[in-house]
Amino acid sequence: MRLNGARAICQSLVEEGVSTIFGLPGGAIMPLYDVLPEFPALHHILVRHEQCAGHMADGYARAAAAIRKPQDQRTVGVCFGTSGPGATNLVTGICNAHMDSVPLVAITANVPNNMIGTDAFQEADITGITIQIGRAHV
């Protein structure tokens, strides 16, 4: 099994104690979905719209915080979205979590690097869009 970006993301999620992910497969993020079966510790919940993924990850982290013991690790909500409209559909959930300091990780795809800034199909500056409502952008 060759380590690639998708496997590195999934392995990192497992190592950080993530067990549940909310998302909707789509074009640019398919490499991540292709390797998910290799990580049985990650339970993916399929949503009908990316906005649901953002809100469900937010709610999941809030609910986990309400029932966790003080010594337990803080549970983070994780959601996936594909490039362009898939990523922008996550924004309301990200903002909602940010407003209440709920730990949420949103992983989105993008167009290939050489196509950024060319108005490529499903290109959106998700970093620029979320700069005010996020702590870190990679």
Which residues make up each language-model segment?
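N-terminal alpha/beta PP-like core and its mobile active-site loop of ThDP/TPP-dependent enzymes
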Residues: 1-137
